[in-house]
A protein has these predicted regions:
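Transmembrane alpha-helical interface segments in multi-pass membrane proteins
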Residues: 391-432, 760, 781-824, 843, ...
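Negatively charged linear elements and acidic catalytic determinants
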Residues: 1-88, 868-873
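Hydrophobic alpha-helical transmembrane segments of polytopic membrane proteins
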Residues: 453-472, 511, 765, 840-862
Length: 875
C-alpha cells in the first residue's frame, strides 16, 4: 500500500526562518526541523507538529537576536573605550570637531526656539480656530484704506443682528496709566479695556476670581500674576484697590496666569469695559469712527460667505447714512486669530507685527551654520581618517566585516555628536539672557525642557551624527586590507580634492556673510547720518499724558522760553517718526478730490523748533486768528502730487470739522523712516480743547536746547517740570533717539547677521586649521627635504599656503556676486539706500586672505622650524 504523504511545515514559519536565521545555518537547520516535524506529525498529528514547529522557529529567532544583542552590547562598550582612547590621543582635532559641532547644534537649538515661538503666535487659545478679528476697510474712489480697529458699536450690533455669532470682545489698549501706590506714581503699560467675555472667548486661566463675574461690574480690574506681585507682594490682591490718576479707583477682582509672550495683544491688566463710562460712549458711535479691536467667536466650520450674504441689510441700517457723509464705502475684513501676526501688513493702528523675512533669515541662518558645522566635521574626519588606514586594514585582517567597520565609525560620529549636543545645550542655557538683550528675544529657560524641542534636538543629534559620519565611514571601510597595511598613511587625490572643495564651500559662505554684514552696517550708518530735512539733534520730546498737565502748558512754555539755553518750545500731537493719517478733500483740477494723507498736528513754533524750512507762504502765526482752525501747511511732495503751481490759498476740507486753506509750503523732510519715500503731508494747528475738534489735545512738548550746556539744561528742565507738575514723573526722550528707534528691526537683523558671520568665520577657520594640520603632517618629509636643500622657513610657509590661496581666491570670486544679490534684495526695502562700494569688497577680500594665511601658517611654521633630521631619520 502506498504511504500517505504528510503536509509540509507551516509556510509562514518556514519563511520567517529563512528570513531571520543566519545564512550559514539555513539549510541544516531547516532540514533538521523538517525531519522532526514529519516524525511528530506521524506520531501525534499535524496540529501538534505545526505548533511544535512554530515554537521552535520563535525560539531560534529569539535566541539568535538575544545573542546578537549581547554581542552588540559588548562591541558597543568596546567602541566607547576605543573612541575615548582616540580622543585622548588626538585631542587637538577632536577639540576642533567638538567646538564646530557644538556651535552648529547650539545655533540650531536657538533657531528652533525662535521658530517655535514665532510660528505658534496666539495658538495657546483653545478657540483660536474660531476666533476672528474684524478689521475695517474704508474704500474711497476704489482705493482701500485699511484699519485694524473698528467702531466700538460694531460688536454689540453684530451680536444683535447675527445670532450665529456666539460672543464678541472689544479690546482697547491704553498707552499708559498713571497708577498711584502710596507715595509712588508709576506709569503702567499694557493695560486694556475689554468686555467681560474676554475671559470666555480667549484662554486666560484665572488663578483667583470668578470668570462669570470678575469683569461684569464697572471700575474692576483683573491683573496678571506678575503685576499683582509687583503691586501687592505676597498679599492676597483680591479686593485691593488700585488708585488711578484723575480716574475712579479700580478694585482687583481676579488674577490670571501670565499670558505667553507670543500673543499679538500683550496684556498685563484688564479693566472692565463698563469702567469710566466707556460703554456709554459706544452707544451711538458711527461705524466710521474706528477705535477698538473687535473679536468674534464663530461656530465651528462656519462659512464666512454666509455672513457676507447677510451683510447688505446690516449696511443699510448702520452704515448707509455715514457713507454719504464721509464719501467712503465701509467693508469688514475677517482675520483668523492665528493669521493676524503676519498677515496684516498695511493696516493702520495695527499691533506690532511679525516679520516673515526675519523668520526666513533666521531659519536659513540655522541651516547654513549646521551645514557648515557638518561639512567641517566631514572634512576633519576624512583628513584624520587617512592616518587610520593601517588600523582599518588590521581590523579587516582580523575578521571585521565592512558592516562592523561602518557601525564602528558611525558610532564614533554619534558619540562626538552627543558630546557636542551636551555642550551646545549648556551653551544655549548660559547665553539666553545675552541673546534676549542683543536680539530682543523673549526666551525663557523653561522653553529648553519642552518635550517637542527635546524630541527635535534628539532627532537633530541622530541626523548630524549619521550625516557627518556616513561618508568617512564608507570611505574608510571600502579600502582593501592589503593596500591599507602596506600604505599605512594615505592621502588619495580624490580625498584631497573633496576636502579642498569643502573648505572652499565654507569660505564662500563666510566671506559672503561678512560682505553682507559690512553693507548692512553701511546702510544703517547711511540712514543715521542722512540729512532728514530737519535738525533732530538736541530736541527733547516730553510726553503730555493727561489734561491737568496740558492746562499748565502755556505757563510752562513761557517759563522755558525765558531760559537762554533753550532756543524754542512747541507742542504737537505727532512728531517725525509717528505721524497720523486723515481723509481730506483737496482743491484739484476737477474740483474737490478725496485723498488720505499723513498729518502732523502742531502748535506755534513747531516748524522753528523742528528746524524745518518754509519755502513758500508763511508759518503759523499767533497774530492770525484763523490759523488755528483753517491754516494748513503742506510739504513740497503734496504740491507736486496735486500739480499746484500756486499752492498758497488752495482749499482743503475734512468733513464738517475743517474748511481750511494752504498758508505755506514746507521743504520736504522725512517724517517717517527711510524705508519709505517722502509722501504728501499736511501740518495742522492744534485746536483749543473747548473747540471740540480733532487735534484738541497736544501729545508732545518739544524743546530745542543749545548743545553747549545740554546736561545742565536737562537738570534745570527736570526741576521746572517737577515744580509745575509735582505729581507727574518727568519722562522724556530725545528726538534723534526716537527716530533711530525706527530702525530697531534693521539693527536686530544686522546684529543677527554679525553673530552669524562670526560663527561662520570661526567654523571655517577651525576647518582650515584642522586641514592645515593634516597637510603639514602629510608633507612633513617634503618640508624636511626642502630644508636640507636650503629653503627658508618663510619660503616653506608660502609654498604650503599656496595650496590654500587658490581655494580662498576661488571662494572670494564666488562669494562676491552671490552676496551682492542678497544685498540688493535687502536694500530693496529702502527708498533711500547706499551704493555698492568696490573698496569694501576689496578690503573684505584682502582681509579674508590675511586671516586665512595667519590661520594656515600656524602648523606650517611649526613644521618648517622642525629639525629635518627628526623627520628623515628612518628614511
Amino acid at each position: 500500500m502506498k504511504k500517505k504523504s504528510l503536509p509540509g511545515p507551516p509556510r509562514l514559519a518556514e519563511r520567517l526562518l529563512k528570513q531571520f536565521f543566519p545564512d550559514e545555518g539555513i539549510f541544516t537547520t531547516i532540514g533538521d526541523l523538517e525531519e522532526v516535524y514529519q516524525s511528530i506529525a506521524e506520531e501525534k498529528g499535524s496540529a501538534k507538529a505545526r505548533f511544535w514547529y512554530r515554537s521552535q522557529v520563535f525560539k531560534s529567532i529569539f535566541s539568535y537576536y538575544k545573542n546578537q544583542l549581547l554581542w552588540s552590547t559588548v562591541m558597543f562598550k568596546n567602541y566607547l573605550v576605543f573612541t575615548s582612547r582616540l580622543i585622548k590621543r588626538d585631542k587637538f582635532h577632536y577639540f576642533l570637531n567638538f567646538l564646530g559641532l557644538s556651535t552648529g547644534i547650539a545655533c540650531c537649538i536657538i533657531t528652533m526656539l525662535f521658530l517655535r515661538n514665532e510660528l505658534t503666535y496666539d495658538q495657546h487659545h483653545t478657540n483660536a480656530d474660531r476666533i476672528y478679528r474684524i478689521s475695517s476697510n474704508y474704500v474711497t474712489s476704489g482705493k482701500p484704506l485699511l484699519y485694524a480697529n473698528t467702531s466700538p458699536a460694531l460688536g454689540p450690533r453684530l451680536k444683535e443682528e447675527y445670532p450665529e455669532i456666539e460672543d464678541f470682545v472689544r479690546v482697547l489698549p491704553l498707552p499708559e496709566l498713571l497708577f498711584r501706590q502710596g507715595d509712588r506714581r508709576l506709569y503702567q503699560e499694557r493695560i486694556v479695556f475689554a468686555d467681560a467675555s474676554i475671559l470666555k472667548v480667549f484662554t486666560h486661566p484665572l488663578l483667583q476670581g470668578d470668570v462669570e463675574t470678575c469683569l461684569e461690574n464697572p471700575n474692576t480690574i483683573v491683573l496678571t500674576e506678575t503685576l499683582a506681585r509687583r503691586y501687592f507682594g505676597d498679599e492676597n490682591p483680591m479686593g485691593k484697590v488700585i488708585q488711578v490718576e484723575n480716574q475712579d479707583d479700580l478694585t482687583v477682582t481676579g488674577v490670571i496666569k501670565n499670558p505667553p509672550r507670543n500673543s499679538h495683544v500683550p496684556i498685563k491688566g484688564i479693566i472692565s469695559y463698563s469702567s469710566w463710562g466707556m460703554d456709554q460712549l459706544a452707544l451711538n458711535v458711527s461705524m466710521y469712527e474706528p477705535s477698538v479691536y473687535t473679536y468674534v467667536l464663530l461656530p465651528e466650520q462656519y462659512n464666512l460667505a454666509t455672513f457676507y450674504e447677510k451683510f447688505p441689510p446690516f449696511y443699510e441700517k448702520y452704515c448707509k447714512a455715514d457713507e454719504e457723509l464721509y464719501g467712503q464705502v465701509y467693508k469688514l475684513i475677517f482675520l483668523n486669530l492665528k493669521d493676524i501676526h503676519y498677515n496684516t501688513v498695511g493696516f493702520r493702528f495695527e499691533m506690532p507685527l511679525g516679520n516673515r523675512s526675519y523668520i526666513y533669515a533666521f531659519f536659513f541662518i540655522g541651516i547654513f551654520i549646521l551645514v557648515l558645522a557638518c561639512v567641517n566635521y566631514v572634512n576633519m574626519a576624512t583628513a584624520r581618517s587617512s592616518t587610520r588606514i593601517r588600523e582599518i586594514g588590521m581590523k579587516k585582517v582580523l575578521g571585521s566585516s565592512k558592516k562592523d567597520l561602518v557601525f564602528q565609525l558611525l558610532g564614533e560620529s554619534l558619540l562626538v555628536s552627543f558630546i557636542a549636543l551636551v555642550f551646545s545645550y549648556g551653551a544655549v542655557l548660559l547665553s539666553l539672557k545675552l541673546l534676549n538683550r542683543l536680539l530682543d528675544f523673549s526666551f525663557e529657560t523653561g522653553m529648553l525642557i519642552n518635550p517637542v524641542l527635546i524630541a527635535a534636538v534628539l532627532g537633530l543629534f541622530l541626523l548630524i551624527g549619521i550625516l557627518s559620519g556616513i561618508y568617512p565611514a564608507f570611505y574608510l571601510s571600502a579600502i582593501r586590507s592589503a593596500t591599507a597595511i602596506s600604505r599605512g598613511f594615505s592621502s588619495s587625490r580624490t580625498g584631497v580634492r573633496i576636502r579642498r572643495i569643502l573648505v572652499a564651500f565654507q569660505f564662500v559662505i563666510s566671506i559672503g556673510v561678512v560682505i553682507i554684514t559690512l553693507f548692512m552696517n553701511r546702510q544703517i550708518e547711511f540712514m543715521r547720518n542722512r540729512d532728514l530735512g530737519f535738525k533732530k539733534e538736541n530736541v527733547v520730546s516730553i510726553r503730555l499724558r493727561d489734561n491737568d498737565v496740558i492746562q499748565k502748558i502755556p505757563t510752562f512754555k513761557q517759563e522755558l522760553i525765558g531760559n537762554p539755553d533753550i532756543i524754542s518750545v512747541a507742542t504737537g500731537i505727532g512728531q517725525p517718526g509717528s505721524p497720523t493719517t486723515g481723509l481730506y478733500k483737496l482743491e484739484g483740477r476737477d474740483g474737490m478730490e478725496d485723498y488720505n494723507f499723513w498729518v502732523l498736528w502742531a502748535g506755534f513754533d513747531f516748524i522753528q523748533t523742528l528746524g524745518a524750512e518754509i519755502v513758500e507762504g508763511r508759518d503759523f502765526d499767533p497774530s492770525f486768528s484763523t490759523d488755528r482752525q483753517k491754516g494748513i501747511i503742506v510739504n513740497e511732495t503734496l504740491v507736486r502730487f496735486m500739480g499746484w503751481d500756486n499752492p498758497v490759498g488752495k482749499r482743503i476740507t475734512q468733513g464738517s470739522h475743517t474748511d481750511g486753506h494752504v498758508i505755506g509750503v514746507v521743504k520736504d523732510f522725512h517724517f517717517a523712516s527711510l524705508h519709505n519715500k517722502i509722501e504728501p503731508m499736511l501740518i495742522r494747528m492744534i485746536s483749543r480743547p473747548e473747540d471740540n475738534l480733532p487735534g484738541s489735545v497736544p501729545g508732545y512738548l518739544m524743546v530745542r536746547l543749545k548743545s553747549q550746556s545740554l546736561t545742565n539744561t536737562m537738570g534745570w528742565l527736570e526741576d521746572r517740570w517737577n515744580k509745575f507738575n509735582p505729581n507727574r514723573p518727568f519722562v522724556f526722550s530725545f528726538l534723534d533717539e526716537s527716530f533711530d528707534r525706527l530702525y530697531d528691526a534693521d539693527r536686530r537683523q544686522n546684529r543677527l547677521v554679525k553673530i552669524f558671520s562670526c560663527i561662520c568665520i570661526i567654523i571655517s577657520l577651525l576647518g582650515l586649521l584642522g586641514l592645515s594640520s593634516f597637510t603639514s603632517l602629510r608633507r612633513t618629509k617634503e618640508v624636511a627635504l626642502r630644508k636640507v636643500l636650503g629653503a627658508s622657513a618663510t619660503q616653506i610657509v608660502l609654498i604650503m599656503f599656496r595650496e590654500f590661496f587658490f581655494l580662498i581666491f576661488l571662494a572670494i570670486v564666488i562669494a562676491i556676486p552671490v552676496s551682492l544679490v542678497f544685498i540688493d534684495m535687502w536694500l530693496g526695502k529702502f527708498a533711500y539706500r547706499t551704493g555698492i562700494s568696490p573698496l569694501l569688497l576689496i578690503a573684505t577680500a584682502i582681509g579674508a586672505i590675511l586671516v586665512a594665511f595667519l590661520t594656515a601658517s600656524y602648523h606650517s611654521l611649526k613644521v618648517a622650524r622642525t629639525n629635518p633630521v627628526e623627520n628623515l631619520r628612518y628614511e
